[in-house]
Structures are given as structure tokens and as C-alpha cells.
Amino acid sequence: MLGQQQQQLYSSAALLTGERSRLLTCYVQDYLECVESLPHDMQRNVSVLRELDNKYQETLKEIDDVYEKYKKEDDLNQKKRLQQLLQRALINSQELGDEKIQIVTQMLELVENRARQMELHSQCFQDPAESERASDKAKMDSSQPERSSRRPRRQRTSESRDLCHMANGIEDCDDQPPKEKKSKSAKKKKRSKAKQEREASPVEFAIDPNEPTYCLCNQVSYGEMIGCDNEQCPIEWFHFSCVSLTYKPKGKWYCPKCRGDNEKTMDKSTEKTKKDRRSR
């Protein structure tokens, strides 16, 4: 009885091994066919693309020649005929450009289809345990809760201040309107104005009562904030709108409570108190 079971197991293993070998052989054959035929198909498309490009260059030269004749021609009838030639040449150049785009699209689809075909065939040899692990990982990734949008508690470290300055600097660069087109510049200005209005009148959020408060307004952190460079500042962080800032200033910056004559200098009395504490 035991011998029959062993023979059945051996037979099943042999069948599985034979089936796997057959699938592997088929995969290798299909792979070789795809790899061998792909260069020929690509070369044919490249040759067609080169021919279209030559015709396109000839058409552009024809357009230049006709346009030069048109500028020098004084006869109205002759100018009208040249206009028709110029129009036909422009239409021809557009058609050639469309054909070139179509050929390039065909080349891209050809490569993608071959790669997709090989990937589909390779799944036959994937380890079942590995497939199960990949499936479980995908389920875990999809079931993870979304990250909280609440700003983390700020700490009094130079590293956190630098990171805040870097983030504000990047956002400030995005807010500056580019000098390309008037329409884009107007849209940028509208978005920047709307952003400033949102910062001036923040929306009521579900606030944690234990969350720390900052700024002169004694509210929680939101939007863009800047840190006072006075290490002894009791408030430390300020909203841009509360201190009349639209972008992060260069160099050091002191809050209204710690500054001296201007926002770049510290109050002398505050600086003196700081030195006295160090001497103690």
C-alpha cells in the first residue's frame, strides 16, 4: 500500500516537472520569436519615418521658396497663385507631420505589446508563495488608514526650524507668478490672492484641545509659518498673515515682541538679558 502511494507521488511529481519543462520551453520559444522579430519591425518603421522626414524637409524648402517669390511678386494674379501653392504646401507638411506621429505611436505600441506578452507568459513560472505574499502586501497597503493632515507638534530645535524654512521657501517659489504669458500671470495672481485670503481668515477645523497654540493670535498652527530667531522667544512660531508677511525673508527674522529697530535686529534689552543668563 505504501509503495503504491510512493509511486503515485513520484508519477505526480514527474507530471508536474514535465508540464513545467514544457511551459518553460514554450516561453523560451515565444521569447526568442519576440526578440528576433522586434528589431526587424522597428527597423521597418524607422525606415518609413526617415522617408517621411525627407519629404517633410523638401516641403519646408518648397514653402520657403514660394514665400520668397510671394514677397517679391507685384502682380496680384501671380500672388494669388503663389498663395494657393503656399496653402497646399502647408497642408502637405501638416499631413506628413501627422503620419510621423502615427508611425512613432505604432513603434511605442509594438514595444509595449511585446513586453506585456512576455510578462504575461512569465507569470506561469512565478512561485505561488511569492504571488500570495504580493497579494497580501497589496491588501495591507490598501487597508492602511490615510495619514492625518494635522501639523505635528513643533519642537524647539534648529533642525525643525530649518525644515520649516525650507518648506516655506519652496511654497513661496511656487506662489511667485512667472513672466511668461499675461494669462498665466493673471491666474497665478488670483491663486495667490485667494491663498492670502484663506490665511487671513482660516477655516474652523476640528481642533484637538491639547494641541499647542502659537503666534500673536494664540491659535494652533496652520498654513505657512515663520520662526523667530530669538532662542528665548516665548511664542516662537508666527502665521505669515499675522505678522504681515507674504514670503519668507532672507537672513534672520525677529517677531514684533523681540525685534529692535527693524525685523532684522533683536531688541537690545532682550539681547542683554540673554547675555546675563549665559554669564550666570
Curated annotation (Swiss-Prot):
GO terms for cellular component: CCAAT-binding factor complex; nucleoplasm; nucleus; plasma membrane; Sin3-type complex. Pfam families: ING (PF12998). GO terms for biological process: DNA damage response; flagellated sperm motility; male germ-line stem cell asymmetric division; male meiosis I; negative regulation of cell migration; negative regulation of gene expression, epigenetic; negative regulation of intrinsic apoptotic signaling pathway in response to DNA damage by p53 class mediator; negative regulation of stem cell population maintenance. There is a cross-link at K195 (Glycyl lysine isopeptide (Lys-Gly) (interchain with G-Cter in SUMO1)). Residues 122-204, 258-280 are annotated as: Disordered. Residues 130-140, 258-274 have a biased composition (Basic and acidic residues). SMART domains: ING, PHD. A zinc finger (PHD-type) spans 212-261. GO terms for molecular function: chromatin binding; DNA binding; histone deacetylase regulator activity; histone H3K4me3 reader activity; histone reader activity; methylated histone binding; phosphatidylinositol binding; protein-containing complex binding. Sumoylation enhances its association with SIN3A and is required for binding to some target gene promoters, this is the case for TMEM71. Residues 181-193 have a biased composition (Basic residues). Its main location: nucleus. The record marks Y214, M225, D229, W237 as: Histone H3K4me3 binding. SUPFAM superfamilies: FYVE/PHD zinc finger. Residues 264-280 are annotated as: PBR. Residues 48-120 form a coiled coil. The keyword Metal-binding applies. It is found in: Nucleus. The keyword Ubl conjugation applies. Zn(2+) 2 binds at C228, C233, C255, C258. Interacts with H3K4me3 and to a lesser extent with H3K4me2. Component of a mSin3A-like complex at least consisting of SIN3A, HDAC1, HDAC2, RBBP4/RbAp48, RBBP7/RbAp46, SAP30 and ING2. The PHD-type zinc finger mediates the binding to H3K4me3. The polybasic region (PBR) is responsive to the binding to phosphoinositides (PtdInsPs), including phosphatidylinositol 5-phosphate (PtdIns(5)P). Belongs to the ING family. This is Inhibitor of growth protein 2. It comes from Homo sapiens (Human). The lineage of its organism: Eukaryota, Metazoa, Chordata, Craniata, Vertebrata. The gene is ING2.
